[in-house]
């Protein structure tokens, strides 16, 4: 065989080999693409069951898992291996409500067994408008919108409402004037994403306005000074910081698992001898809502003193239970509904006879009442 023929055969062999190799490469590429496509259809992910808090493994479309991941990054209440943490993801320009409502029904039983009942209600309306969010700090305007209170007993009732005209009764005018001067004002709140209140400012103009509002009712300088001092002690940055922290930041900074409980204790009396304990438990995080249950109170306390031959014995007890719900997307409180029952009994005795008076108060404390 001539050299030329041998070269032609070798060239044909190389061409044939290359064609087969390209076919295999193309086939392999199609198989690879098919496999990648299959992998993109589903993906195994680990999730936390919101009801039980247990870790479960499920197959989900990869698009859905990606969407889930993106949504989780935007949520204010997120979980990491079953531990839920609360933050705030508020939107610039949006306004968030914080309306508090409390109703008390008290029944007193006299020593002769006769009973007398009375009730009272109070509503405070305010909203929070987000002005800006910069370097992890929210700039928020607190809008003081309205205050209403009412009392009813023995078939009679009185109402003080900033959205209605000034009451005619002299004893009610002062409270109405103070409340009327208070609403319509704004405060400025600086808060970080964790809910830590950095500052609340804007009190001085409100102090001036409220003090001036009672000028026609309080004429003596000493009384005006005493009133201004008392008002400042009940309405200031420290008081509002405590109120907002208590109402807005519910989940501990370390986080909580489904079923976890944590307890907070505060003084129920100025001397701190009686403590109020509140136990919270993370019940569930599902459908965009975190649900927290509330229980606790003040255990039964007894006190006895004798003076001038008269022994005075007193027992008291407080219990509370209810539910708080938070919006998972923003971290803001959606609703709170807590029932509080206070029982008190007082007995006077001279050793020969005794008289006992009992009092039972049932209260409902609601934040952002459901309309």
What are these regions (language model features)?
Residues 35-37:
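C-terminal motif of bacterial Sec signal peptides marking the signal peptidase cleavage site
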Residues 25-33:
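Sec-dependent N-terminal signal peptides
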Residues 7:
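Cationic, low-complexity basic patches in intrinsically disordered or flexible, solvent-exposed regions
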Residues 2, 18-25, 39-40:
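Positively charged n-region of N-terminal signal peptides that target proteins for export
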Residues 41-371:
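Signature of exported/secreted
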């Amino acid at each position: 065989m001539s050299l030329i023929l041998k070269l032609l055969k070798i060239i044909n062999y190389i061409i044939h080999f290359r064609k087969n190799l390209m076919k295999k490469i193309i086939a392999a590429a199609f198989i690879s693409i098919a496999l990648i496509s299959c992998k993109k259809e589903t993906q195994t992910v680990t999730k936390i069951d919101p009801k039980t808090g247990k870790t479960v493994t499920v197959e989900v479309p990869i698009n859905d898992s990606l969407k889930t991941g993106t949504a989780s990054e935007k949520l204010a209440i997120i979980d990491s291996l079953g531990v839920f943490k609360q933050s705030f993801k508020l939107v610039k320009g949006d306004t968030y409500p914080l309306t508090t409502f409390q109703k008390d029904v008290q029944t007193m039983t006299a020593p002769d067994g006769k009973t007398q009942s009375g009730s009272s209600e109070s509503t405070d309306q305010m909203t929070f408008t987000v002005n800006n969010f910069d370097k992890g700090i929210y700039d928020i305007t607190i809008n003081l919108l309205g205050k209403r209170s009412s009392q009813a007993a023995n078939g009679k009732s009185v109402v003080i409402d900033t959205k209605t005209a000034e009451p005619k009764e002299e004893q009610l005018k002062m409270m109405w004037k103070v409340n009327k001067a208070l609403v319509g004002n704004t405060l400025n709140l600086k808060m970080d994403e964790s809910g830590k209140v950095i500052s609340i400012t804007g009190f001085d103009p409100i102090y001036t306005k409220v003090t001036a509002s009672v000028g026609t009712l309080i004429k003596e300088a000493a009384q005006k000074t005493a009133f201004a001092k008392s008002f400042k002690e009940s309405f200031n940055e420290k008081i509002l910081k405590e109120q907002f922290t208590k109402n807005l930041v519910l989940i501990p900074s370390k986080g909580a698992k489904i079923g976890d409980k944590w307890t907070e204790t505060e003084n129920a009396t100025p001397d701190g001898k009686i403590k109020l304990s509140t136990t919270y438990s993370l019940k569930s995080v599902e459908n965009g809502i975190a649900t927290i249950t509330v229980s606790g109170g003040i255990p039964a306390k007894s006190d006895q003193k004798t003076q001038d031959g008269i022994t005075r014995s007193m027992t008291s007890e407080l219990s509370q239970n209810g539910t708080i719900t938070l919006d998972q997307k923003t971290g803001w409180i959606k609703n709170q509904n807590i029932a509080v029952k206070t029982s008190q009994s007082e007995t006077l005795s001279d050793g020969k006879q005794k008289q006992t008076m009992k009092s039972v108060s049932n209260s409902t404390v609601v934040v952002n009442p459901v309309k």
